[in-house]
Regions:
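N-terminal active-site segment of His-dependent metallophosphoesterases
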Residues: 1-64, 152, 166-175
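A general structural motif
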Residues: 5, 50, 74-76, 108, ...
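Active-site neighborhood of phospho(di)ester-bond hydrolases with catalytic His/Asp-centered motifs
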Residues: 11-12, 53-58, 77-83, 113-114, ...
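A generic local structural motif
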Residues: 39-42, 64-68, 98-100, 115-119
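Short, conserved, surface-exposed binding loops centered on an aromatic residue
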Residues: 45-46, 68-73, 103
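Metal-dependent catalytic neighborhoods of phosphoester/phosphodiester hydrolases
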Residues: 57-73, 81, 86-98, 122-125, ...
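Conserved beta-sheet core of the metallophosphoesterase superfamily
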Residues: 93-171
Length: 175
């Protein structure tokens, strides 16, 4: 029997160690080390060690010790591969699972997890949600589509329960 999950969290596009991305996205941190520390602190303040968390890609680029970083983050961690996740990141021992795509049911919702926002997805017409990263909050979502990346989510993970259709520019409409 598996461990009890207290909460299910999602995040994407942390880009730990990626100084060029920090500047490009105008993230409000004075340095890459400061960004990394703030993102890790926000993650650990939100996610309990027993929680489940899905990272939807672009975990770390250029970080000096991604294995130690991952080990220091709370939760049972799963990775959906992003375009900036090489095999060295995908294969870290700290991931509970590591894959290109996932379909799962949590809290009564069928979820499609992929790094990229999809135009169409499995069970879309039956109410399934598409959770993604990659776009850093810059795309208008389709109904039931959510960018869970740190840029549009206050630089912290978000619980599935807090994703509300129609709640803002990075949330899908209830249609």
């Amino acid at each position: 029997m598996g461990a009890t999950i207290l909460a299910c969290w999602f995040t994407a596009d942390t880009h730990f160690g990626h100084g060029a991305l920090r500047a490009l996205m105008r993230r409000p941190f004075d340095s890459t080390a400061g960004m990394d520390a703030a993102l890790a602190a926000a993650w650990n303040a939100a996610v309990a060690p027993e929680d489940e968390i899905w990272h939807l890609g672009d975990f770390a680029i250029g970080h000096p010790d991604p294995a130690a970083l991952l080990a220091g983050l709370h939760g049972r961690k799963h990775l959906i591969w992003g375009n900036n996740d090489p095999p060295a990141i995908r294969d870290l021992a700290g991931w509970a699972s590591s894959q290109a795509y996932a379909e799962l049911e949590r809290e009564g919702r069928f979820l499609i997890l992929f790094h990229y926002p999809l135009r169409s997805w499995n069970r879309q017409s039956k109410g399934a949600w598409n959770l993604h990263g990659h776009s850093h909050g810059r795309l208008k979502p389709l109904p039931r589509q959510f960018d869970v990346g740190v840029d549009p989510r206050g630089f912290r993970p978000i619980r599935l329960a807090d994703l509300t259709p129609g709640a803002g520019p990075t949330s899908g409409d209830a249609a």
